[in-house]
Amino acid sequence: MEALLIVILVATGVAVGLGQGLLGVGGAFIMVPVMVAVFEHMGWDRDPAVKIAFGTSLLVILPAAVATTAAHHRRGAIWWKAALVMGAAGAAGSLLGSTLTTRVIGGEIMKIVFGVVGLLASIRLVTARPKESPEPSPETPLLWAGVGFLVGLFSGLLGAGGGIVAVPLMVSVLRFRMHQAVATSAAVMVFTTGAGALGYFIHGQGVSGLPEGSFGYFYPVAWLCLAPTSIALTQVGTWALPRVSAGALRIAFALVMVAVGLHMIGLY
């Protein structure tokens, strides 16, 4: 891989880490388009480039989700009973999603779908403010499982953690308090990203024509460029959160997501 491409991926890891630490969202919606562009510049075909970007993205998000979950657990903020139910269902959904993307739908279509979802997510990032229910969260295991499965399906299909859909669903449908939803969502993402990454790895075994250096739908060089910087900068972003304007950051991050979404769709 060219030195410039490595620098681009490392810089992307910095941006992803800051975005996750400051806003709690956005990792995959920055990582995946950059990886696809880098892989295509390296001469890869679009279909494996998209699938490998999805699989690698999930494995970048996984350690960050583990670290975030540990921090929330130390504060006693996670509702573990709900997290385990949603996580188990989410793992099943993520495995199904990774199977659909790698075996049924294909990378060309999923690149466009990813772009559309990125545009919708950018709108939600700026405008949505889920309202908390004044009543305590009820224990509804079947509903937990349903929401977890949907979050996992989203995660596996698009190589994303799923937090951008999990938190509003937990608040509006499951009636979680916001802080409880954010913390529990991190725990659920450990299951969804782990299962999804495993699915992309397994479904990539024995596939002919994959680029040299990839293991299934996973590219270790990209992971090494993205994961350490994103994890480290997540802590910096968390530290900087009280010191910056969250509103301005949301708008700036949303504009970046719009730009990469339009690029993934193919409008420029």
Residue ranges and their predicted role:
Residues 1-22, 30-51, 67-154, 172-173, ...:
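Juxtamembrane transmembrane-helix boundary motif
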Residues 24-34, 159-169:
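Transmembrane helix boundary and interhelical junction motifs in multipass membrane proteins
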Residues 27, 194-199:
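Hydrophobic alpha-helical transmembrane segments that constitute the membrane-spanning cores
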Residues 54-61, 87, 91, 185-193, ...:
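Transmembrane helix-bundle signature of multi-pass membrane transporters/permeases
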Residues 62-64, 197, 216:
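A structural-propensity feature for long, helix-poor, extended segments
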Residues 169-191:
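Small-residue-rich alpha-helical segments with characteristic i,i+4
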Residues 182-185, 191, 195, 229, ...:
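Generic hydrophobic alpha-helical scaffold/packing signal
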